[in-house]
Curated annotation (Swiss-Prot):
GO terms for biological process: ribosomal small subunit assembly; translation. Belongs to the universal ribosomal protein uS19 family. PANTHER family: RIBOSOMAL PROTEIN S19P FAMILY MEMBER, SMALL RIBOSOMAL SUBUNIT PROTEIN US19M. This is Small ribosomal subunit protein uS19. One of its GO terms (molecular function) is structural constituent of ribosome. Gene3D superfamilies: 30s Ribosomal Protein S19, Chain A. It holds the Pfam family Ribosomal_S19. The gene is rpsS. GO terms for cellular component: cytoplasm; small ribosomal subunit. Keywords: Ribonucleoprotein, Ribosomal protein, RNA-binding, rRNA-binding.
Amino acid sequence: MARSIWKGPFVDGYLLKKADASRATGRSEVIKIWSRRSTILPQFVGLTFGVYNGHKHVPVNVTEEMIGHKFGEFSPTRTFHGHSADKKARRG
């Protein structure tokens, strides 16, 4: 079930402060965040966030198309190594 419109998008408070501070300094450095549940807002466009995936911070450059999505969608937590080959098919 989607979030109610009257509640508005969820964003951790510290995330807004970090984004505003980064815009004020004008430096393009990676902002490390652990809040995968936060929604990407229009004021984050152009910034680079390091979204934690449980192992490392994955750099995510925010673009217009990402607005409304969650940060966690762009930082996968699992690595797929492929399925094992069918042993019957290999025998010939």
